[in-house]
Amino acid sequence: MNYDPGPLPAILDRTRLVYSYTNLNCYENVCPYQFYERYIKKSTPFVETEAMRYGTKVHEALEHRIAHKKPLHPDFAQWEPFAAPFDGFHDDTRDKTVPRQALSTELKLGITVKGECCDFFDNANVWLRGKLDVVVLNGFNRAYINDWKTGNSNYEDRFELDVGALMLHAANPHLTTIKGTYTWLKENRLGEMYDLSDTRHAWTKVTGIVKRIERDRQTGQFEKRPGPLCGFCDVKHCEHNKKR
């Protein structure tokens, strides 16, 4: 017999959540109940899919190419035109007349509940954290973020870039201009260029989602939202799960 007692009563739910784009997006754009099962109750074990493994290999290859000039594997050589432009950025602190240009790959960032910068691994204080694929600090007050995507671009949502810009600005409060793109590798194209400079907007959106999560934790009620992704969901006891 499968018996699911449902969400924990608020008085018993003491899980400390560290937020990320991934879990915020799960709650906001996929299903609040899936969010609960995955990130609070943790009833669904993480299973790495073939697509995930492929994405990791691609990210690692591009990181080594950009950060260490290691040639791309022949399987990924078609994406050299997306990596080559980053070769022109440097960090030359010897010539003070040249605006500082710093290039980072797989940059780990974190912020506290007050929106202040903290270490990605500061488990006592980190409230939101994430990893940015490529970051260029170009000059004294400008930055550019790029996010590699190995899937399809059926629907391009800037929220992931906004979350990245929020954390980047916390670490570099002097920044006045932040722009960002997704690179859709499967389609060999660059996505829309977004102006991410208004990080207050991102902060408002993130805190709004968190408030709704905390409300649901207090009531113990997380919406079971039917949608096209139900057929891929690992919460098998949900009545909307097409795998049942």
Predicted regions mapped to residue ranges:
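Nuclease-adjacent, charged terminal/linker segments that flank catalytic cores
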Residues: 1-11
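Nuclease catalytic cores
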Residues: 14-71, 106-107
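Short acidic (Asp/Glu) and glycine-rich catalytic loops that position anionic groups and cofactors
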Residues: 35-41, 142-146, 182-191, 236
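Metal-dependent nuclease catalytic regions and adjoining charged, substrate-binding loops involved
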Residues: 112-118, 124, 156, 169-244
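Short beta-strand-loop-alpha-helix junction that forms the active-site gateway
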Residues: 148-154
